[in-house]
Amino acid sequence: MTDPLELLLFTTDVEFAQAAERAGIDGLIVDWESKGKNERQRGHDMETNADTADDVVRIATAVSCPVIVRVNGMGPHTPNEIELALDCGARGLILPMSMTAADVSRFLDLVDSRARTIVQVETQALVEELDALVKLDWDAVYIGLHDLMLSRGAQSMWQAVLDGTVEHVFRTLHERRVGFAGATVVGGGHPIRFTQILQELSRLGASLTFLRRSFKREIQDRDMAAEINSIQAAWAASNARGPDAVHTDQQALYTELQRFIGV
């Protein structure tokens, strides 16, 4: 039987968080990452949040599912951010923008098994240290396509899929919990249909993904629990495909990505 796809949602809206928990979302992310983010993402359609410690407390006291805090990238501030997040009720921590496996190792030492650890692989420098990263005792990895695009000077976030970088991460971190891209309602997704992304997540052996920022908009006037169930049903169907269907679906996705990028 296929394990469900772990779905994590960014929100500081208590009512939405409670509805998401009832619908079957696995965890809620409060986003503290802000240092240097506006500068590196200027000119790109990317989201920058300004969540606070109070947001963590409000969400953590309103739900029973895990609340996860994305702290800033490793720096002198990291020990204090980790302690504050834990004091506020965080049960998981996400480290973004690591440049080295040593950064990740330091982060893990600071957390000291007190919370789940998710490492974002979103710099070319860390991609080049995967052999060291796989030896560390983190809980999950999420490939951040947007910042990886900026790190590599690429024209599209999808180039890392087309050129095999994403597959290389999955294969190197084989049998660990890894995810990328984003989920939304079945039938949604632009410019690439979500079901195509879901099929690629399945092909690569993904375990988790984040809900897209468009999810809250696309879920309007829909039954959230029914939509989450539809995602999991589509996930199970993706995992039930035979080798020929997997290959055909991959080729269709890559053709669509090439058309979108213009290569």
Identify the role of each PLM range.
Residues 65-96:
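Glycine/small-residue-rich loop that forms an oxyanion/phosphate-binding "nest" at active or ligand-binding sites
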Residues 1-65, 74-76, 256-263:
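Conserved N-terminal beta1-alpha1 strand-loop-helix module at the mouth
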Residues 36-59, 75-79, 96-115, 125-131, ...:
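Active-site-adjacent beta->alpha loops and helix N-cap segments on the catalytic face
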Residues 14-22, 76-88, 103, 124-137, ...:
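Catalytic cores of alpha/beta
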Residues 58-66, 169-178, 204:
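A structural motif corresponding to the C-terminal end of an alpha-helix
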Residues 5-11, 28-30, 67-71, 93-95, ...:
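Hydrophobic faces of well-ordered beta-strands that scaffold small-molecule active sites
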Residues 23-28, 86-92, 111-117, 135-142, ...:
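Glycine-enriched alpha-helix->loop->beta-strand junction motifs that scaffold or abut catalytic
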Residues 31, 36-42, 149, 161, ...:
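Active-site pocket-lining/capping segments in soluble small-molecule metabolic enzymes
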